[in-house]
Amino acid sequence: MTITLKTPHTMINAQDKAQLAQKGISEEKFNEQMACFEKGFPFLKLEGAAAIGKGILKPSDAETADYLAAWNDYKNGAHKIVKFVPASGAASRMFKDLFAFADAEYDAPQSDFEKTFFNNINEAAFYADLNAACLRLHGKDIPALLADGAYKAVVKTLLGKDGLNYGALPKGLLKFHRYTEGARTPLEEHLVEGTLYAKGKDGKVNVHFTVSPEHRALFEALAAEKAPQYAAAHDAAFDISFSEQKPSTDTPAANADNTPFRQKDGSLLFRPGGHGALIENLNDIDADVVFIKNIDNVVPDRLKGDTVTYKQLLAGVLVKLQAEAFAMLRKLDEGATEAEMQEMLHWLQEKCFCYAPDGETLTGDKLHKYLKTKLNRPMRACGMVRNVGEPGGGPFLAYNSDGTVSPQILESSQIDMADAEKKAMFEQGTHFNPVDLVCALKDYKGNRFHLPQYVDPLTGFISHKSKDGRELKALELPGLWNGAMSDWTTVFVEVPLSTFNPVKTVNDLYREQHK
């Protein structure tokens, strides 16, 4: 969808044009994005929150067994399966409270968070490394430093570049879990996980990590070092690959008056566009089925059972649904009767919760075209967890630009909270999005879909940041599992809370799920 401007933007100079060309961003794209600052983004029109029986499947034990069998059959066929892990996230936010403690005027832990960190420090998977670094830098081990009241020395050794540098590393490279044979990072846990549900009949496990350029070499080195032992232990062969967000997905920043934000040297300021930029990386992957899960949502081996079961359940739901859609598409090509097309329309409503406002009146060529459009597109099965706390991003039935209603994963920023009815829909949501997706990326003829064409560009959002002490507006691209997959066939499946164990703060590593 092209956003037209009311007034032409004559705000770029020759230096800007060279900068845009270097990043691979067209002037047209730049002007469209600058226009977004003026126009903003519309809220989505909601039909309601999804729930069990209304957009969210809750398979019975018998159905679950069928889905698990379907996935087992599929992965033993001639299909390429890839595990895709967004892993560029820095760990700095994990240590926000410890950075604050290091800068505090007091020297001994005072807050509950600080006390919890030090009281449990000997349980941390990184304890042995930290202890060795303390001995190297301070000539004392952790117990001796704590006995001396040198709490900050321990924290600075953990976070600083002379020590473990955990304050600057990405989460994927930190030691999360202890085992008798040593500690494991999330990268390693994802490799092991891949062997348990994404191994093809040839024994190959394809794992792709998206990383930031400055950490890529560290990821590659750790993967090269660790993969052989996990391959041997799980009778697998790994194909591990990496990619970075493309410079062409960076977005311009704006001043308060919506003019381009310029740096001190006069150049335009661009910022990473958020996880929605990864739709380009996903589009570069040649695979039939792709599993997507965030880097920090991992558990030790003793708790992997639920994760593995429900990943396979999601995949089974997906491949069974896809097989049915493919059969219908072939039927449409051969020539389907009006009655058969009405059955397909009913299938879209019953199985995919995809409704056309004029569905009852669609017939003939119009119905054929509608079915072809809705059946022949990327598909995804998304795990949804029952809300236990405050509602966050979650599953909804929302209106699309063509007037149809379909399942969408929405963030609170996409919903008009000033509208009491919409706010109530958000607050009544029974489930949240844990980022647990299984995606089908090829059509019924075996061709890859071009994923960027299924993005809804009107689902980005504007956030407020600062640079060099100056306020700026930042443009966030449609989120990877939000607007970037807006025009996909989407089904939601209930999964248990036990499959969702993210690490948001360092103290989360002391929770039972990470021991």
Map each language-model feature to its residues.
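N-terminal regions that are enriched for targeting/export leaders
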Residues: 2-52
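Primarily single-stranded nucleic-acid-binding OB-fold modules
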Residues: 353-380, 389-393, 404-410, 416-515
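Non-catalytic interaction surface on structured domains
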Residues: 2-4, 72-73, 499-501
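Domain-scale recognition of functional cores that engage charged ligands
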Residues: 17-24, 35, 49-388, 397-409, ...
